[in-house]
Amino acid sequence: MNSQSNLTQFLKDSESYKTIPIVETITVDTLSPIQIVEKLKQDIVYLLESKDESSSWSRYSFIGLHPFLTLHDDQNKYIARDAAGQKLMQKQELKELLDWMKEQYQIKTPDIDIPFTGGAVGYLSYDLIPTLTSVRPHRSASTIENAHICLPTMIAFDHETNHVHFIQYTQLTGHETEDEKIRAYKEKQKQLEQMIHKLHSKVDMKELILSGNMNEPPSFEHVTSTYEKAQFLKDVEKIKEYIRAGDIFQGVLSQRFDIPVSVSSFELYRVLRIVNPSPYMYFMKLKDRDLVGSSPERLIHAKNGHLEIHPIAGTRKRGTTREEDAELARELLEDEKEKAEHYMLVDLARNDVGRVAEYGSVSVPTFTKVVNFSHVMHIISIVTGKLKRDTHPVDALMSAFPAGTLTGAPKIRAMQLLNEMEPEPRETYGGCIAYIGFDGNIDSCITIRTMSVKNHTASIQAGAGIVADSVPENEWEETCNKAGALLKAIQLAEHIFSEKESVQDESPTISSC
């Protein structure tokens, strides 16, 4: 570590900025993001990880520690609070609060070539939609806040180079003497060295060994649903009636599954990343719950004014050989129902990008390409555009939110109908996980294939896209199948990590899944 040159740069940066990064980079061999979290877990707030070797989207994992600022919504306003919970600022919109933060803290971004070097990390609940659209709130009040957390310490793990970048932001008031700046620098440098030293220590971590039982189907024993099956089937028919009447083209009806758990959220995550690896994986500690997820689908990416959405619709299980994969891909691209749904979602994405893009800049450089993931293949297109001048990147995020793949089309009418039918507010399901960088860049994924873990209960929500020729029983089964990978992860985690009998309740089992 070249501390003297770093100090010289730090003092120079302090002339123009109040929040200055100190960066140290190490190269590792056997260390993994999982081991880093285990060794530093008392301080960890989130792990954002890419885990799908066959996907070109996967390269970086990001770990956040020591929150200093939380941005959350409260009665249609956004509030910034410090680590002690003291209210610092209130604004009408998230983008206004982010702009205040940028001005207040005068943050310098580090000169390092990675997509995220620090910023706000968090989630937007699906139930945010009444503040963005004319859709009325769900009849049952949502219990979850929208929140983004800013952290002074971040670790970026580059899986391609095996470099681990430690970024420590140092906050100044702007009135320090040079001696005070040097002391502040040395204190942060010491914290960095202590953190890196911890990574050399041994950790008591139970090895995750999965055997042949990975291939067994998930059990729905002790799993309950918020939706009565008979009502779900009736609501599928209702949506088909609205489609025949011309109100909508598609509606995504969902149900929530609850299952008791006795293992930790991070143990659930460790198994999920093996059972269902995806380009967007996350373990997040929130105020009243943890989120554990493996989403395959980007919501929107904004970098230096370039916007990108990846509509996904159309799915087949992977084959066992290249030849079988090729045959399945051909069948998928010839399936008229799958193609029609995909075309509709591409049009939705073009519309979402078009609202915030320069006129004439929206394009579809990749159209209906079959991409292989670990267990499935999807039809994917890419829609791009150039952000309008003087338009905030957060406006692009809000334009795409919520994803049409989780609502149906047209979005507004579909969301209105879903709010009338679904028995509970969606909360995190169908929302997004996002990072909003200090540099204004954004990456986000749709909150699907996700567990919300609270009070020893894991909640999993899954939906089915209802179209004119949908068979109600098949749509019910589709929601059960989509929840299956996460239920399997829970049951494997209980088998591997639990030192006591699994937590049970007296709720009836869903025997029909």
Curated annotation (Swiss-Prot):
Its EC number is 4.1.3.27. Binds 1 Mg(2+) ion per subunit. Pfam families: Anth_synt_I_N (PF04715), Chorismate_bind (PF00425). Pathway: Amino-acid biosynthesis; L-tryptophan biosynthesis; L-tryptophan from chorismate: step 1/5. Its cofactor is Mg(2+). One of its GO terms (molecular function) is anthranilate synthase activity. Belongs to the anthranilate synthase component I family. Heterotetramer consisting of two non-identical subunits: a beta subunit (TrpG) and a large alpha subunit (TrpE). This is Anthranilate synthase component 1. The gene is trpE.
